[in-house]
Regions:
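P-loop/Walker A NTP-binding region and its immediately flanking N-terminal helices
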Residues: 2-198, 208, 216
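Extended, largely alpha-helical regulatory/partner-binding modules appended to the mid-to-C-terminal parts
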Residues: 86, 110-114, 129-132, 145, ...
Length: 330
């Protein structure tokens, strides 16, 4: 019985080998947000105030031991942190323009640098996890100039974990640099804030988002309607990563490498621009019943109410600005 079972198992193994198709990396699809992740400060859109401060610190070698990057999701906090780690550990020396080709730069880009320790605080909230991390700080970098600790969603740490960090943040080894990232600055203890240089990341403007999408679209040989990109940028609400996810989705939906305004409006369930002019006409009649009927039609069709109100406010603003040529620059 045992021999028969072993023979059957071996037979199944041979069948699996016969039908096994080796993994081919060229066949795997890489999402656009990862494929076009910026590799240097020059590749980034927006956050000029943050970039200039970091570039000055690198060029003048006035490095702080702890940084706090705060801002909404998808605005470049972890991306800039990784580029900053490259700048610190590039084999050409501390520089604001890392080579991108040395072993240190390549390892950081590929996410396998042993001296860039990335921690997801949301899944390691306990004080014991923090103590394990801090115990690691006492050891010298394995192959780099600095050990960089990138703690994402740091606001998720417990109060005990924050307290355990205080001493290390105040007097870290010369080779250790901490970069804390959060979307909720108000949850960070004041004692932590006082030990960090704090950089507030802004939402990415619609213009910068469209510029970035156009660059990627050109690299992917896509045909893009400007109105379609404008809707995507508005829907992303300043989060460039969200814009790239929506853009990626639309590339898959359209299929023919043509991103059309009509397809974007339909699939993102947002109002066509012409609809706002229809609403304006209804308002001009000052008939409350007609206005309520239009609103009911919009909501019953499943349109996002908040996005509709934001779009309506922008529409009326554009109309008022358009009435006076001197205010167009606004």
């Amino acid at each position: 019985g045992v021999r028969y079972t072993m023979l059957m198992a071996f037979g199944r193994f041979l069948l699996q080998c016969a039908y096994y198709t080796p993994y081919n990396p060229a066949m795997s699809y890489q999402v656009l947000a990862r494929k076009y992740r910026p590799a240097s400060f020059q590749d980034l859109e927006g956050q000029e105030h943050v970039l200039q401060a970091l570039i000055n610190a690198l060029d003048n070698e006035r490095l702080h031991h702890a940084y706090l990057f705060t801002g909404t999701r998808g605005v470049g906090k972890t991306t800039i942190a990784r580029i900053f780690a490259k700048c610190l550990n590039c084999e050409q020396g501390v520089t604001s323009e890392p080579c991108g080709t040395c072993s240190s730069c390549v390892e950081i880009s590929e996410g396998r640098s042993v001296d860039l320790i990335e921690v997801d605080a949301a899944s390691r909230t306990g004080v014991d996890d923090m103590r394990d991390l801090l115990d690691n700080v006492q050891y010298l970098p394995t192959a780099s100039r600095f050990k960089v600790y990138l703690i994402d969603e740091v606001h998720m740490l417990s109060k005990s974990s924050f307290n355990a960090m205080l001493k290390t943040l105040e007097e870290p080894p010369a080779y250790a640099i901490f970069i804390l990232a959060t979307t909720e600055r108000h949850k960070i203890l004041p004692t932590i804030l006082s030990r960090c240089q704090v950089f507030t990341f802004n939402r990415i403007s619609v213009a910068d988002t469209i510029k970035h999408l156009k660059g990627i679209g050109a690299s992917e040989d896509l045909v893009m309607e400007d109105e379609a990109l404008h809707v995507i940028a508005q829907k992303a609400d300043g989060a460039l990563r969200d814009a790239l996810s929506i853009f990626d989705q639309m590339v898959s939906i359209c299929g023919d490498k043509h991103i059309r305004y009509a397809d974007v409006v339909k699939n993102l369930n947002v109002l066509d621009y012409d609809y706002y002019f229809k609403i304006t006409d209804v308002f001009s009649t000052q008939n409350v019943g007609d206005v309520l009927l239009v609103f009911d039609e919009i909501l019953s069709n499943g349109f996002d109410g908040q996005i509709f109100l934001n779009g309506l406010a922008n529409h009326f603003r554009d109309l008022m600005v358009g009435r006076n040529p001197e205010t167009v620059k606004l």
